[in-house]
Amino acid sequence: MDRAGATARADAAGAVDRADAGAAGRGVRRLPRVRGFAPWPPQGSPKEEGKALRAGVPRSAHRTLRLDPARPDAVSAVAESNAGRLPELTPLRVGRMAATPFAFLRGSAGLMAYDLARTPVTGIGTQICGDAHAANFGLYGDARGGLVIDLNDFDETAHGPWEWDLKRLAVSLVLAGREAGADEDTCRAAARDAAGAYRRTMRLLAKLPALDAWNAVADEELVSHTDAHDLLGTLRRVAEKARANTSGRFAAKSTEAVPGGGRRFVPAPPVLRRIPDTEAAAVATALEPYVDTLGEDRRPLLARYAVHDVAFRVVGTGSVGTRSYVVLLLDHRGEPLVLQVKEARPAALVPHLATAGFPVPAVPHEGRRVVLGQKRMQVVSDTLLGWTTVEGRPYQVRQFRNRKGSVDPAALAADQIDDYARMTGALLARAHSHGADPRLIAGYCGKNEELDEAMAAFAVAYADRTEEDHADLVAAIKAGRIEAEPGV
């Protein structure tokens, strides 16, 4: 009986094998095409498809900067970007933008998107940061207590042309270098090195197994890969400070004990201020739907904290004037965890996507857009990253002071700015490779330095334009045409 059963099973298996072999010989697949997965056999070569795009958009074309005659002037652009912000804080924002040309660039993502929409693009889309300037890279903590180097600001993230991020990074490096006192050759070389590192890293990722490329983490290997050894000392110092930059340290400096137990924020105007009870209650109540946006495995962690206080806190340069709160949580031992609840405004580049031939996405919730964009671009993201709505406005929620640290690119020595450029260029390539096939972008970028030189030429030209825009803003402030509060 057992022998007969075994024989029957063997015959059946042989029949299946013969059927599979026959189907394969006739070009018939045993399995159907599965939605969400790559087709088999592969259809075409992404590398060759990317290479073919050079015929329509030569790599040298990226040096082109032709400003639209209808381009808004700097003062009008700043005033327009202030719309919808808290009016009492817009002078502070203008004052920060007027500090230097690099600061102006940081606050004028919308104006640059207007200009970029009129530059050549290949049509390759990916998840882009939308504001990938040199100061938007930094260190932050992962769930295991380690530090990761990556992009760290995604307010403007959207699906768009990869070239826009790379050009914004290159321009910012020129401006940061000039502010640091570097000569023009050094500044131009930094922009060129960023593009070169982007190109080489994309080629490296294109050759790796898909899972290895996806999980490539920025660490010492990245510094070695990008030849950024002169930057190691600076990164170690920043990392040391970042490890101490925690919720506990912030709470120790910014809160006080209250009678009956617990703590509350201590006002430090104009940066940190108390808010009316009704406003604080609205923010606290909005944490309930926020919890629902987290993975179920994270919810028991927050259930071990009580909400003690809410305050308003001014942040950033481009973000000044948006509504941003800090929420103090305390566990059973009185140990703090601080969350940031930050208003999520529409991405500044979205109105310009159609001009570049990209579809304008439907966005059901701006906080959700920011969070999902961040998770797509980063290898490791904040485990408490989520979104909510406060009094009809969308917000993103994240940990505040999660061992964050950053390098000030405008304070780097001349022998470090090119190292920083290579590191950030490589990080940007890794982030873009999550939203687009790296083989496609690598095929377009190629092996030689044609793209690098074009990006450097564009960066210098646009940096010059930004300096003119900055000068126009400073003149308008002096003439009383726009209000500014400098030095805060």
Mark where each language-model region is.
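Catalytic cores of glycan-processing enzymes that make or break glycosidic bonds
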Residues: G25-P32, P41
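Long, low-complexity, charge-biased intrinsically disordered regions
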Residues: A158, V258-P259, R273, A280, ...
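Surface-exposed beta-loop-beta
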Residues: R263, P267-P300, D309
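Asp/Glu-rich intrinsically disordered low-complexity tracts
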Residues: D2-D20
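Sequence-structural signature of the catalytic-core scaffold of metal-dependent phosphohydrolases
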Residues: L204-A280
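Conserved ATP-binding subdomain of kinase catalytic cores across diverse folds
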Residues: V34, P39-T90, G95-C129, A134-V238, ...
